[in-house]
Amino acid sequence: MSRYVIERNLPEGLSDGDVDAAVRRTVAVNADLPTVTWIGSHLATDHRKFFCIYEAPGPEVIRKAARLAEIPCDVVTEVRPVDPESYADSQL
């Protein structure tokens, strides 16, 4: 499985209730798509953008999940994890 960052541009004036409803739809859709794993997301404080981390066999299944959940899927970028633990034993 590959890992992806998804950038979702959200409409202005989105409420917390709107965000909660979108998250519930996403969870329901992903339950029916076993090849898609939602790792987590970060919501911009102005509620205008979501940055989501997914594992999937390819970007097309991520876009399909977004369509089914009726949420935006503006940019899908394949990434590789880089974290502090990966470098804990290295010499600086």
Regions found by a protein language model. Give the residues of each.
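Short S/T/G/P-rich N-terminal loop/turn motif that feeds into the first structured element of a domain
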Residues: 1-32, 44, 81-92
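Short, well-ordered beta-strand segments in beta-rich or mixed alpha/beta enzyme
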Residues: 4-8, 39-65
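Generic helix-packing signal
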Residues: 26, 30, 34, 56, ...
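A short linear hydrophobic-aromatic micro-motif
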Residues: 35-41, 75
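Short amphipathic alpha-helical patches
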Residues: 50-53, 74-76, 85-92
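An amphipathic, aromatic/His-enriched active-site/gating alpha helix that lines ligand/cofactor pockets
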Residues: 56-82
